[in-house]
């Protein structure tokens, strides 16, 4: 049974991941407060507790410094290729910020106290801490978890999806979208049908989250038919003379056999994600491809949402393919989005007269410093 396109294309249904909100740090603060409460209720003397905390803190910071020394042993061989020959840049990259040193000094002060009842000297305690930290590093037990890697790449905007989204925007959408209305206006002179659908004069970008892209849309759905090409945009870019950019205009046939024009294309960077997951050299799994496809949609949505040049000139249509093949799923999805745009346009038009009258009123009032009659029949 065919599923309602609105449910398959809604953001809630697609489960687009939003940026993480720092709840892990909040949880750490809560657990820290719980630990303080437990220590307070234990009734133990305060001085030994502070000394133990300082020794543990020193051991942790010592581990950070030892890890930096191990990183330095590798990075010194990449001094010129990665760090422009700057030894200071290598040191800053390998070792933590300055406040780590302060924590190390504060924690290390605990080792200056006399040895405890167990007879272990401060020197032995420091040596054992170094031994444990180096053992952890040698066994590779300090690797970041998958969640930490994901958060790090997303927060620094250095994942594959973010790079593809920016490349798609800078190299293509920012070039062609500002001229879209002009191209549609020119094409409408020979295709009067377009004038009745000005509310959908946008580039409709299909974003299949499974990365299944058809090169020929007419083969994907028989209700989608090619109509014409929009006027070409010709530019000289990156040494290529008269580089050509163009869009294709399609008509979508609805259940009443009516035709709706639509400028339509797939988001081509998704082909890159699909090819990467099929190439062993890329080491890109299917799960990573699906995650990056969703992040690509989110990144592109955010980039276009903040672009003044592209405002009102595009429509992102993200969707998941149905589990069971549906011959007219794609055309039904596109028609639903076209109807949504038409409703949105009507809502704007209903609010427009109120806005226009208020503008006229403000112009009449501000035309002179003296009070003026608002009625035209008053002298």
From Swiss-Prot:
Quote the PTM field.
Answer: Phosphorylation by TBK1 leads to activation and production of IFN-beta. Following cyclic nucleotide (c-di-GMP or cGAMP)-binding, activation and translocation from the endoplasmic reticulum, STING1 is phosphorylated by TBK1 at Ser-366 in the pLxIS motif. The phosphorylated pLxIS motif constitutes an IRF3-binding motif, leading to recruitment of the transcription factor IRF3 to induce type-I interferons and other cytokines.
Entry GO CC: autophagosome; autophagosome membrane; cytoplasm; cytoplasmic vesicle; endoplasmic reticulum membrane; endoplasmic reticulum-Golgi intermediate compartment membrane; Golgi membrane; perinuclear region of cytoplasm
Which residues are listed for 3',3'-c-di-GMP binding in this entry?
167, 172, 243-246, 268
**GO-annotated biological processes:** activation of innate immune response; autophagosome assembly; cGAS/STING signaling pathway; defense response to virus; innate immune response; positive regulation of interferon-beta production; positive regulation of macroautophagy; positive regulation of type I interferon production
| UniProt-recorded Gene Ontology molecular function terms | 2',3'-cyclic GMP-AMP binding; cyclic-di-GMP binding; protein homodimerization activity; proton channel activity
Give the reaction(s) catalysed: H(+)(in) = H(+)(out)
What subcellular compartments does it reside in?
Answer: Endoplasmic reticulum membrane; Cytoplasm, Perinuclear region; Endoplasmic reticulum-Golgi intermediate compartment membrane; Golgi apparatus membrane
Q: Pfam families attached here?
A: STING_LBD (PF15009), STING_TM (PF23417)
Kindly give the InterPro entries that the UniProt entry links to this protein.
STING, STING_C_chordates, STING_C_sf, STING_LBD, STING_TM
Spans within the Lumenal topological domain: 41-50, 112-121
Alphabetic keyword roster: Autophagy, Cytoplasm, Cytoplasmic vesicle, Endoplasmic reticulum, Golgi apparatus, Immunity, Innate immunity, Ion channel, Ion transport, Membrane, Nucleotide-binding, Phosphoprotein, Transmembrane, Transmembrane helix, Transport
Segments on the Cytoplasmic face: 1-23, 76-97, 140-379
Task: Give the record's membrane topology.
Answer: Multi-pass membrane protein
Question: Residues bearing Phosphoserine?
Answer: 366
Motif: pLxIS motif; annotated at 363-366
The record's region (Cyclic dinucleotide-binding domain (CBD)) falls at: 158-345
The residues that hold 2',3'-cGAMP are 167-172, 243-246, 268
Identify the domain of life.
Eukaryota
Residues annotated as transmembrane = 24-40, 51-75, 98-111, 122-139
Which family, according to UniProt?
A: Belongs to the STING family.
According to its UniProt entry, what is the function of this protein? Facilitator of innate immune signaling that acts as a sensor of cytosolic DNA from bacteria and viruses and promotes the production of type I interferon (IFN-alpha and IFN-beta). Innate immune response is triggered in response to non-CpG double-stranded DNA from viruses and bacteria delivered to the cytoplasm. Acts by binding cyclic dinucleotides: recognizes and binds cyclic di-GMP (c-di-GMP), a second messenger produced by bacteria, and cyclic GMP-AMP (cGAMP), a messenger produced by CGAS in response to DNA virus in the cytosol.
Query: Domain comment?
Result: In absence of cGAMP, the transmembrane and cytoplasmic regions interact to form an integrated, domain-swapped dimeric assembly. In absence of cyclic nucleotide (c-di-GMP or cGAMP), the protein is autoinhibited by an intramolecular interaction between the cyclic dinucleotide-binding domain (CBD) and the C-terminal tail (CTT). Following cGAMP-binding, the cyclic dinucleotide-binding domain (CBD) is closed, leading to a 180 degrees rotation of the CBD domain relative to the transmembrane domain.
State the oligomer form and interacting partners: Homodimer; forms a homodimer in absence of cyclic nucleotide (c-di-GMP or cGAMP). Homotetramer; in presence of cyclic nucleotide (c-di-GMP or cGAMP), forms tetramers and higher-order oligomers through side-by-side packing. Interacts (when phosphorylated) with IRF3; following activation and phosphorylation on the pLxIS motif by TBK1, recruits IRF3.
Name it.
Stimulator of interferon genes protein
Q: Which organism is it from?
A: Gallus gallus
């Amino acid at each position: 049974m065919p599923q309602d396109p609105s449910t398959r294309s809604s953001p809630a249904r697609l489960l687009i991941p939003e940026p993480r909100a720092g709840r892990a740090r909040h949880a750490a603060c809560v657990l820290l407060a719980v630990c303080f409460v437990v220590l307070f209720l234990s009734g133990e003397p305060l001085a030994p507790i502070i000394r133990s905390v300082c020794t543990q803190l020193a051991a942790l910071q010592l581990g950070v410094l030892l890890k930096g020394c191990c990183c330095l042993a590798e990075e010194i061989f990449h001094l010129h290729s990665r760090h422009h020959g700057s030894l200071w840049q290598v040191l800053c990259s390998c070792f933590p910020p300055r406040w780590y040193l302060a924590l190390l000094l504060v924690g290390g002060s605990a080792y200056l106290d006399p040895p405890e009842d167990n007879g272990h000297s401060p020197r032995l305690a420091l040596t054992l801490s170094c031994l444990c930290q180096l053992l952890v590093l040698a066994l590779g037990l300090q690797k970041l978890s998958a969640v930490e890697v994901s958060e790090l790449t997303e927060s620094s905007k250095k994942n594959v999806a973010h790079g593809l989204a920016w490349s798609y925007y800078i190299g293509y959408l920012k070039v062609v979208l500002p001229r879209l209305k002009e191209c549609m206006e020119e094409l409408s002179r020979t295709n009067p049908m377009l004038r009745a659908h000005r509310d959908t004069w946008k580039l409709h970008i299909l974003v299949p989250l499974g990365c299944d892209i058809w090169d020929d849309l007419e083969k994907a759905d028989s209700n989608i038919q090619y109509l014409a090409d929009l006027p070409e945009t010709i530019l000289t870019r990156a040494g290529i003379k008269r580089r050509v950019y163009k869009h294709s205009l399609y008509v979508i046939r609805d259940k009443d056999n009516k035709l709706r024009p639509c400028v339509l294309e797939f988001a081509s960077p998704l082909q890159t994600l699909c090819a990467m997951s099929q190439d062993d050299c890329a080491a890109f799994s299917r799960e990573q491809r699906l995650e990056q496809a969703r992040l690509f949609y989110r990144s592109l949505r955010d980039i276009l949402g903040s672009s003044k040049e592209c405002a009102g000139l595009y429509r992102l249509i993200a969707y998941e393919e149905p589990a069971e093949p549906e011959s007219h799923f794609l055309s039904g999805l596109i028609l639903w989005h076209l109807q949504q745009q038409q409703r949105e346009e009507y809502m704007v038009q209903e609010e427009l007269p109120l806005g226009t009258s208020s503008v006229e009123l403000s112009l009449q009032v501000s035309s002179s410093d003296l009070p003026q009659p608002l009625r035209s029949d008053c002298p």
